[in-house]
């Protein structure tokens, strides 16, 4: 039987890795020769989950057409986020929870996209719909994906469906979702050994907001002071990026996974936009952003609206 590769996006997070493993297992149970693979390095958070539930990580690939004709995408659909040669293979299925953009196929396909916080939440339904029991280890990985994407149910992207799925999966996995989740998030928040350049580029995205060119980077931490103790060095490398890219604003967001607040470090000529957006005053280029954890829902739209009004 011809093999089908199942994979998440480049720079994979825990959902991209764990949902690829979980869906490949379901497809195998249903008779398909499916193999999970990954398009990037495994993060510390994801490795913690794999080690905890004693599951081997998928192998790394950059291209897929040299191996297979057919693939399944999880946790993404946009071409630029997928395998380098995605245009050379047939996409059989997409299981996702993001916007649909830059995606078209030459053949009909099974496409399932739901407005939930995590792909694994959808997969939990699909296991039930197909009458397939979820193994303890796989349930643990799916739970890990939901905890990661929802920041232990605190993110505004989290839905009641995500919480309900997590409770079911935690029971199967034999763990307490809260205590295990905090342990996993802490593992992901261990930034020791990272250079300042790595810290500001671990999870950075560039945006055009009105006439302003803005970059927003975000890291999770158990204590924001562990990161901000290096503020002088951070400002130095951020200023270099601002100059190199011609940015109007670089906002470096350090999110405390225990309090679910963030501290924003704003550098650039348009740093005052952060003050207007959040009704705060920057002191030494920083401000506390109470209750802000999601770049997608709580930072990008708010700053965009502010810049458009300037």
Curated annotation (Swiss-Prot):
A Pfam family that the UniProt record links to this protein: DHH
What InterPro entries does this protein's entry cite? DDH_dom, DHH_sf, DHHA2, DHHA2_dom_sf, Mn-dep_inorganic_PyrPase
Listed binding positions for Mn(2+) 1 are 9, 13, 75
What catalytic reaction does the record list? diphosphate + H2O = 2 phosphate + H(+)
One cellular-component annotation, GO: cytoplasm
What is its cofactor?
Mn(2+)
Q: Binding of Mn(2+) 2: at which residues?
A: 15, 75, 97, 149
What does the note under cofactor report? Answer: Binds 2 manganese ions per subunit.
Recorded hits in SMART domains, A to Z, give:
DHHA2
- Enzyme nomenclature, EC number: 3.6.1.1
Cellular compartments annotated: Cytoplasm
Q: Which UniProt keywords apply?
A: Cytoplasm, Hydrolase, Manganese, Metal-binding
Molecular function via GO? inorganic diphosphate phosphatase activity; manganese ion binding
Task: Tell me the protein family, please.
Answer: Belongs to the PPase class C family.
PANTHER family in the record, alphabetically?
BNIP - RELATED, MANGANESE-DEPENDENT INORGANIC PYROPHOSPHATASE-RELATED
This protein is called Probable manganese-dependent inorganic pyrophosphatase
What gene is this protein translated from?
ppaC
């Amino acid at each position: 039987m011809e093999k089908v590769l199942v994979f998440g996006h480049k720079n994979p997070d825990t959902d991209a890795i764990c949902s690829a493993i979980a869906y490949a297992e379901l497809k195998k149970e249903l008779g398909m020769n499916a193999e999970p693979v990954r398009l990037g390095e495994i993060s510390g958070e994801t490795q913690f989950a794999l080690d905890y539930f004693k599951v081997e990580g998928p192998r790394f690939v950059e291209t897929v057409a040299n191996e297979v004709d057919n693939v399944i995408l999880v946790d993404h659909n946009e071409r630029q986020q997928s395998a380098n040669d995605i245009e050379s293979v047939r996409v059989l299925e997409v299981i996702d929870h993001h916007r649909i953009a830059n995606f078209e196929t030459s053949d009909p396909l099974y496409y399932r996209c739901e407005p939930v916080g995590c792909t694994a939440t959808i997969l939990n339904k699909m296991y039930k719909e197909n009458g397939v029991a979820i193994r303890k280890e796989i349930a643990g990985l799916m739970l890990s994906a939901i905890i990661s994407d929802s920041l232990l149910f605190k993110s505004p992207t989290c839905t009641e469906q995500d919480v309900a799925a997590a409770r079911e999966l935690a029971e199967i996995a034999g763990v307490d979702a809260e205590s295990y989740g905090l342990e996993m998030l802490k593992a992901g928040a261990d930034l020791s050994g990272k250079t300042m350049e790595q810290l500001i580029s671990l999870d950075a995205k560039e945006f055009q907001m009105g006439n302003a060119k803005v970059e927003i980077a975000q890291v999770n931490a158990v204590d924001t002071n562990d990161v901000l103790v290096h503020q002088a060095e951070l400002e130095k490398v951020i200023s270099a990026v601002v100059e190199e890219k011609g940015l109007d604003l670089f906002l470096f967001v350090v999110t405390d996974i225990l309090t679910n607040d963030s501290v924003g470090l704003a550098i650039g000529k348009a740093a005052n936009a952060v003050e207007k957006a959040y009704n705060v005053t920057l002191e030494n280029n920083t401000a506390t952003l109470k209750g802000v954890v999601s770049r997608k829902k709580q930072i990008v739209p708010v700053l965009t609206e502010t810049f458009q009004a300037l």
